[in-house]
């Protein structure tokens, strides 16, 4: 397959490198020092699942130079969604699809408004990975899985082709017929995890070990679950309990990407995570005081470090 990776950070860099290693035609879109390092030294992935080094990856800062592709793995930060979608729109004009592997539950609609609904599928990435230094992706733990699925029936063939490509490249992947539910299943945990680790400035190990923080994490997830159910998402009755067990299984040192962004003085995805829970809860008439408070505390930092 011909694949473009829009955003060669932790998620895009890891899975793009795996697909390239598997023999697929993969081009990365990156910028700044990461772009320069990839051009000079290649792309390196450090992972307990096996290190990867692509000595001469196809990389550019201009998607217009890539030409038509079958799939765009769309992994930019949420604040760049519309501008990045506009940049890759020409790449899928001849029948390709954009699959957002982002946080949040609104990317399909946001990208579809720019590129056309027929060109957007849904995707969920389960991985903890980040740019350790320019040109180097560091994967924490061993979780590295993709779930994706069509939104329209005409997208089924390309979804199946990508599934085969992933499995051939050694990527744990699953095709789902209910991508909306899959997105919400991740969102419920992630919105609470990212919000609370950022506000507390502590990794998941500290959060789950402290009784007060653990209770707050569970309460934030219960609020998000209630919002999802109010929107017709079929979450299991014991879903939050399952997610608490999932949280207990994660490496104690794991931090959310939003916590890392906060520490670095970068912009935050809070408006589309805990902020989105609070906003959608208000629209649905569902109480969400924990998420509203998490968002209120993080709001001053959403545009970057407070000077």
Predicted regions: what is each one?
Residues 52-136:
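Rossmann-like NAD(P)(H) cofactor-binding subdomain of soluble oxidoreductases
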Residues 28, 58-60, 148:
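Generic preference for hydrophobic
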Residues 17, 21, 86-90, 113, ...:
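Short, well-ordered alpha-helices that flank and scaffold nucleotide-derived cofactor binding pockets
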Residues 24, 43, 96, 171, ...:
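Short phosphate-binding/catalytic loops that engage adenosine nucleotides
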Residues 37, 90-91, 113-119, 123, ...:
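Internal alpha-helical scaffold of NAD(P)-dependent oxidoreductase catalytic cores
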